[in-house]
Amino acid sequence: MFTLKKPLLVLFFLATINLSLCEQERNAEEERRDDDERNVEVEKRFFPIVGKLLSGLFGK
């Protein structure tokens, strides 16, 4: 019985480490993706404001 427990324990340990590493990588990828989305949102907010200011300065 002990001969079966030891390999199963090792497999469980390795799987836990693997899942932990995958989770860290996924979190890092989500953070990078969030930064890109924020940059797009800032651009979307910035361009209409600049357009309104320029149209106000030059008049239509």
Swiss-Prot record:
UniProt note on tissues of expression: Expressed by the skin glands.
Signal peptide start and end residues: 1-22
Propeptide positions: 23-43
Entry's localization field: Secreted
Keywords of this entry: Amphibian defense peptide, Antibiotic, Antimicrobial, Cleavage on pair of basic residues, Cytolysis, Fungicide, Hemolysis, Secreted, Signal
GO BP of this protein: defense response to bacterium; defense response to fungus; killing of cells of another organism
Pfam families hit by this protein: FSAP_sig_propep
Family in the record: Belongs to the frog skin active peptide (FSAP) family. Temporin subfamily.
Its job: Antimicrobial peptide active against a variety of Gram-positive bacterial strains but not against Gram-negative bacteria. Has weak antifungal activity against a slime mold isolate. Has weak hemolytic activity against human erythrocytes.
Protein name, as recorded: Temporin-CG2
Originating organism: Amolops chunganensis (Chungan torrent frog)
